[in-house]
Amino acid sequence: MSFTSLPDMVLEPVIRAALMEDLGQYGDITTRAVIPSDTRYTARLNAREAGVVSGMQIARIAFHLVDPTLKVETLVQDGAPCAPGQVLMTIEGAAASILSAERVALNFAGRLTGIASLTAQFVAETKGTTTRITCTRKTTPGLRLVEKLAVLHGGGFNHRFSLSDAILIKDNHIAAAGGVRAVLEATKAVASHMVKVEIEVDRLDQLEEVLAVGGADVVLLDNMDTETLRTAVALAAGKLVLEASGNMKLERIAEVAATGVDYISSGALTHSAQTLDLGLDF
């Protein structure tokens, strides 16, 4: 997918759930106790570290779900770089509303900016090649949509959103079905022409069998060393899209991209990204 934003209504259910979790049954009782309802402020959402911004759309929605009268101005758009001390967003209106939405807005923005920033580092390592960086389904339960959106903001690409998006034959499928040929023949018998088929291999002889049998659009080269990946690219000779996966850490990306694979997929983009330090100041 190539989108870098979504309609607000698509994102709202995830944000509403987070607000309900945070506000609880009785709402923000601290703010109600100490802040007069007519108190107004302008708050600034600041970056405290350098990175690539994500989650500004979601932060805006969070503030507006709590109070539609808040005036929210996004100063740095999703996908843009940020520097320490830079103001990313201003929020003007009832102080109580701003405080009640603060933590949810910051949690989303910090988490997603961390993912976008790590993705951008991976993408930078592919410079000078045609290799693309893609994420996986190793996402936080319930947050896959927004975490994959953050990958796009960092310059990466998305893999499947769900098991229903494409056929991806993994090692356990191959073992249960009786081998590469058996699983590909079974897939060819039922797969629609609209459905992409990807198969995982971890040995070159399996790749050779995939090429001989046919029926796959993409081959996932799992846990192969760099030299084996280079041989796999030569064997495929452009007949299939090749995706390298398994142990794809940042320090290895440049050498893997240089082998000529089409994609490098890494679960680390979403499961290992560190939240970027953002703050909200009055």
PLM feature spans:
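Short secondary-structure boundary segments
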Residues: 222-223, 246, 267-268
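Active-site loop ensemble at the mouth of alpha/beta enzyme cores that anchors a bound cofactor
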Residues: 279-282
